[in-house]
């Protein structure tokens, strides 16, 4: 793949600001795919970007199968220029079914602490349609790693969503102070596991000027404060309820148009 690799050193609390600045200032070629590590982060980032009139969709583990397929279809058709996707290695969900943000998976249901609502989930959602693996994201020009990938293999897998079919691509990774050792290990080991990356190098992303970011800081911090845990939790519940209602309609659509669903796998 013909990919240019960049890093942006940023404090964790400034990731929302820097991601918004990249997209708002038009520094990322469309379409762009933003990888995060938690469903809550995906929802919060989507809500945050919407406040700046940046329309995007979010793809994460808690959405019904048919809704995921529909969201991916819209992204591939160009309805959205930006997609936020939860990476395969999702720390927010552990082995006993606990989910980040105060919910718990019991069988095929999501139980939320906020309302006690039981939200039915497609029982085969993760087995048949993983958020990232096996999905064909079409014509992605830029990958943004909002959260630093866990290792070199994960990095290659995520940035490999761009630069396909002979096209050029760009990968931008946010590196917080706690991620410095992780990104150093990624840079060291990538040539060992990818024969095409012998000349691999992570370069500073210099197109984003500090003064341009700072000009957006005041409003960004004000907006970020308004999207706390409670707001994310409420949005998460509303989103899942809405998508579950839509899921039956989408299931009927895909049953009538099986070719559309098969193209997404």
Feature locations, PLM:
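Short strand-loop junctions, especially beta-strand C-caps/beta-turns
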Residues: 6, 59-62
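Conserved interdomain hinge at the start of the Helicase C-terminal
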Residues: 1-54
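Arginine-glycine-biased low-complexity disordered regions
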Residues: 44-54, 61-82, 87-142, 146-265
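Structural motif
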Residues: 33-37, 59, 174
